[in-house]
Regions:
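Conserved short submotifs of the Hanks-type protein kinase catalytic core
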Residues: 95-113
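ATP-binding glycine-rich loop module of kinase domains
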Residues: 24-75
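Activation segment/activation loop of eukaryotic-type protein kinase catalytic domains
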Residues: 157-204
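Juxta-kinase regulatory segment immediately upstream of eukaryotic protein kinase catalytic domains
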Residues: 1-25
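Terminal C-lobe "cap" of eukaryotic-type protein kinase domains
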Residues: 266-289
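Short beta-strand micro-motifs within the conserved protein kinase catalytic domain, predominantly
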Residues: 83-100
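Protein kinase catalytic-loop region centered on the HRD/HxD motif
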Residues: 139-150
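Activation segment of protein kinase catalytic domains, centered on the conserved DFG
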Residues: 119-135
């Protein structure tokens, strides 16, 4: 039997020597008897989380429950449930004894309790972030209870982890079991591993092992109680020590209190369904939740709604926790722009948010999106990029400009819109110094020679000024050629310049 279970967990049955991940430092907290480690992939160095559970006896009940947790996490997929990557079980010599250890590898996450200490939020910002997190965990619980007819069994602060984008994920599936409503008369345990749950987290029917009552209750009854425990721990700032402490509601926000009390109703059949909490809770009606929700369904919004939203977003972002804006909103915004669901006003917001990042982080989190956007066919996007190029142009490498950016920017030299031609011309003050001699001589000068006879007098004049400004970046042959053109140009229009200000 153990051999079968081990194969279920390990897949190929590989030992730790073949483990494709490096186990790193340990977090201070984790759910149950598990240990939560930082880790990295041996293939590409990408970060992961590694959870380990050890025992001297492979048949130890904690190990058996741990294998249930592995199986459940592997098979249950949802955006608000921790993403499973890999698992294995290894036997390692620990002195004269053999230690059996189960390893689960997941997306990189951090215990919620530790992330909250790190963020150190207060007041409205804290409540808005808690609302977003609770909204996510409620969706995970609703999915398990209502869609899958599964019971998690121990929803609490320790069973929640936080991703690098500050999203909350539900995990700790060792207790998770099917909701066995078709066997109401049975007195046998429905949750095989309920002994793992601390007594302070158990509703009355579970603490009494009243399985008949549990089977007659809705599938969300136990986990709704758990959501109440999570809410208490979040706002009190302390781990739940006794069930009686749940009656202390002094720290619970008034807008959440009615829902909190319904989640913890002493009658299981009257407890609030998590789906109703998601749909109706007043506590979830705040700027952060509404902003993220809007951005996640951006492709369903019409142009007017998008434009209105993005014109308001800079002011909203100023009021939200800076780390949440940079780690959650900015990646969603960048992705929306890349896939075409966001329009030009969103680019202005992206650049504003990006200005709050250190230079190295801007190059990692914002610049790749900007480079991709230069290939856009949206004229408004192209115009916005050119208009703001002074904000990011210096951050682009010469190779990126020469190979990825200039070929797309160059189409603007022959655009039918004079404004685009003018912006393209002015962008060369930033881009030309990063171009190769081959590109300058073979492409740029040809485009500029055409602009010298442009129908717009301002463009003709600015082209001549630009040639003088970039001559120092050319080789001797090209520079001499430009100088001859520069001194021989006669144009009666003289009020334009590359900065857009009159002479």
């Amino acid at each position: 039997m153990f051999k079968f279970l081990k194969e279920v967990v390990a897949g190929s049955g590989s030992g730790l020597k073949d483990f494709p991940y490096t186990i790193g430092e340990t977090y201070a907290s984790a759910w149950g008897s598990w240990t939560h480690h930082r880790g990295t992939s041996k293939d590409d160095g990408s970060p992961v989380s590694i959870f380990s559970l050890s025992g001297s006896n492979p048949q130890d009940r904690h190990m058996v429950a741990g294998r249930n947790g592995v199986k459940r996490l592997r098979t249950v997929r949802h955006p608000n449930i921790l993403s499973f990557l890999h698992s294995t079980e290894a036997e390692v010599a620990d002195g004269p004894a053999i230690k059996h250890t189960i390893y689960i590898v997941t997306e990189p996450v951090m215990p919620l309790s530790e992330k909250l200490k790190e963020l150190n939020l207060g007041g409205t910002q804290r409540d808005e972030y808690f609302a977003w997190g609770l909204h996510q965990i409620s969706k995970a619980v609703s999915f398990l209870n209502n869609d899958c007819k599964l019971v998690h069994g121990n929803v609490c602060l320790a069973s929640v982890v936080v991703t690098q984008t500050l999203d909350w994920k539900l995990h700790a599936f060792d207790v998770l079991s099917e909701f066995d409503a078709n066997n109401e008369a049975s007195g046998s345990p429905m949750l095989q591993f309920e002994w793992l749950v601390g007594m302070q987290y158990k509703p009355m029917e579970l603490s009494k092992s009243d399985w008949a009552s549990i089977r007659k209750s809705p599938p969300w009854a136990i986990d709704s109680w758990g959501l109440g425990c999570l809410i208490y721990e979040l706002f009190s700032g302390a781990k739940l020590a006794r069930t009686e402490d749940l009656r202390n509601t002094a720290s619970i926000p008034k807008s959440l209190l009615p829902d909190y009390q319904r989640l913890l109703n002493s009658t299981p059949t009257r407890r609030l369904n998590p789906s109703k909490l998601i749909d109706n809770s007043e506590f979830f009606q705040n700027k952060l939740v509404e902003t993220i929700q809007f951005m996640e369904i951006l492709n369903l919004k019409d142009t007017f709604e998008k434009d209105s939203f993005f014109r308001k977003l800079p002011n909203i972002a100023e009021q939200l926790p800076r780390e949440i804006v940079l780690k959650k909103l900015l990646p969603v915004l960048a992705s929306s722009l890349e896939f075409g669901s966001a329009a030009a006003p969103a680019l202005t917001v992206l650049l504003k948010m990006g200005s709050w990042l250190p230079t190295d982080q801007f190059s990692i989190k914002v610049l790749p999106t900007i480079v991709k956007l230069f290939a856009s066919n949206d004229r408004a996007i192209r115009a916005c990029l050119l208009h703001h190029i002074d904000q990011f142009g210096e951050s682009m490498s010469a190779q990126t400009v020469d190979e990825q950016v200039f070929p797309h920017v160059a189409t603007g030299f022959s655009d039918t819109d004079g404004t685009i031609r003018e912006l393209t011309l002015k962008s060369m003050l930033i881009l030309a110094p990063k171009l190769s001699q081959r590109t300058i001589s073979g492409s740029l000068l040809k485009y500029l020679s055409k602009l010298q006879v442009d129908e717009e007098p301002g463009i003709r004049t600015n082209t001549t000024i630009l040639l003088g400004n970039i001559a120092s970046y050319m080789n001797d042959g090209a520079s001499a050629s430009v100088f001859k053109v520069y001194v021989s140009v006669e144009d009666t229009f003289f009020t334009a310049d590359l900065t857009g200000t009159p002479d």
